[in-house]
Amino acid sequence: MKPFVGDHTIETILVDYTPHLIKRIGLFLLVLAAAIMMLTGCGGGGSSSSGGKETSAKPTSQLEKISSYVKATNGFNGHNVRFAFSIDKVLAKMKAGEDLDFASFPAYNSLKENLTKAKTESSGFSDIDESTTAVLKVLDEMVPLTSKMESYYTSKEYTTDGNQKGREMVASYLKLYDQFNTEYSKLDSAISQHNSELRDLLIEEMKKDNKVMAATYMEISRDMRRALEAIDPEDPAKTDKAQIEKLLGQVKENMEKLKPAEDVSGVKSFKSSAERAIGRIRTYLAGGGGNDAFNDMVEAYNDFIRDSNRIDASELDNKKK
């Protein structure tokens, strides 16, 4: 993934960890979090995933188990998107062998703290647990190093030694950076995969339980994410625009169907941000790609997910009193 200079660009600077566009989408897209945790009474349904631990637990209980991991990576990815410009700029200079006079990094420290807390209980999936351990191992070296680098440049110590110490730390950082990107991409992918699988199971259970509005709400988020994941940021020309338009059409169709019997907080904002995300996706595809359009698209998507997470799905099927 693209050099991580910068979550979620996600790309160059925004969300991914590769020197070019590659699959930064995976690392910078926020994941739908726990609004579903509020849902109760869903039927049981087992889930089993390659690389993960088999489980017969209900989707809701499994989603609850991984929710702390989702929040940890969402926070990290979101920070990278917001501060992508400065993070990417610094990373580009390091990779070009230029001396730095300023340091800006992803939020490694908070990621370490949040993953350490999450790890106190198993996620329920072996691949998530193993990847978390691997990421934390790299962060044990990354966090103190970046702290020293920030202090070194903030204090302007680099002016007293001709940046010699700075070059040494940059070399160490770039090695750790590659290791981190490798391990974090595995973790991010595992969390996203299991989260998606569990939500598909939950959608089916909700339909069986006649929770039509809650299922529709989840389908909107699912299809929006699938539309973005179908985009090839390295070569936009290879993107199947027809497939993406089909998914976006399903999103718009379901937004028309999402009409709770009672006013539910956040639904209007959710629909507005969905429309904005659809517009940014279409703009990106129509323009043939480009970093600015890509970052705008991912930012709009992440805003959509934030609004999604503000909805209490358990209220969507309440009947008027």
Task: List each language-model region with its residue ranges.
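Bacterial N-terminal signal peptides that target proteins for export
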Residues: 17-29
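C-terminal motif of bacterial Sec signal peptides marking the signal peptidase cleavage site
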Residues: 38-41
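Bacterial signal peptide processing site
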Residues: 43-45
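Immediate post-signal-peptide N-terminus of mature secreted/exported proteins
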Residues: 48-102, 166-174, 178, 189, ...
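N-terminal Sec/ER secretory leader and immediately downstream segment
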Residues: 59-166
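Secondary-structure edge/capping motif, primarily at the C-terminal ends of alpha-helices
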Residues: 80-97, 118-125, 146-160, 194, ...
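Extended amphipathic alpha-helical interaction segments
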Residues: 166-271
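A cross-kingdom marker for long, charged
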Residues: 246-321
